[in-house]
Amino acid sequence: MPVVGRAEAQVPAAGPIRPKLYDEEVMTESNEIPEPPAIAWEVFPGEAMDRARVYAELLAGSGVERGLLGPREVPRIWDRHMLNCGVVAEVVPENTTLVDIGSGAGLPGVVLAIIRPDVRVTLLEPLLRRTVFLSEITEILKLDNVEVLRGRAEELAYKRVFDVATARAVTPLDRLVAWSLPLLREGGELLAMKGERAAEEIENARRQLQASGARSVELVTVGEGKVEPPTTLVRVVAGRPPGNGKRRRRKR
């Protein structure tokens, strides 16, 4: 499974990063991004805010042009996308490895990599045009903690092991559990970003959770007081699959 792109191991100099991100002649008022709300500086502290603003511009420019983000999403890019994903960093353990399944335009994987340089992030995406976009933005943002990998989660099962898996708007929970738990060490966590039907999805996934050897499942709310509505996560802790001893423990 080929690695499409890896960011250079170089930290940008202090100050804002301002590359040319799109064809300015085709940029219109409809996809000009709003100023970030004040809370964004808390979610993206220090240098992370410079990178976050550039990433938001990338999404609104090249991301819209390539069909990775709808133009109607641009006016709410901070609240609905950047901050909604950024608050997930609150529950990601320190110094971990994380795979973002079906990363798409990089939400939440790129956002988490910006906020948490201590976390090694793999952006897993099957479509070539998306992996090309992800590789370009990781290089522009100089995220040396990011790997872009073209492929599907089910193809990577038991070949790589991670501490955390994330996913946003990829597939129903039962299928996501089947794809993600084989990528996790025993005790690793799936953090699935879900909406108001999250509890219903958990009930519909009970059989798959048991078959996949899930140790526990719970609803977690993050970002209260920072985003409205707060972000809802389904957190699944991986156990040992029934009759399967392949899952690995984290090395200490």
Residue ranges and their predicted role:
Residues 3-4, 8-95, 99, 129-146:
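Class I SAM-dependent transferase core
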Residues 105-118:
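Conserved SAM-binding loop of SAM-dependent methyltransferases across substrates and taxa
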Residues 102:
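Conserved glycine-centered beta->alpha loop in an early N-terminal alpha/beta scaffold
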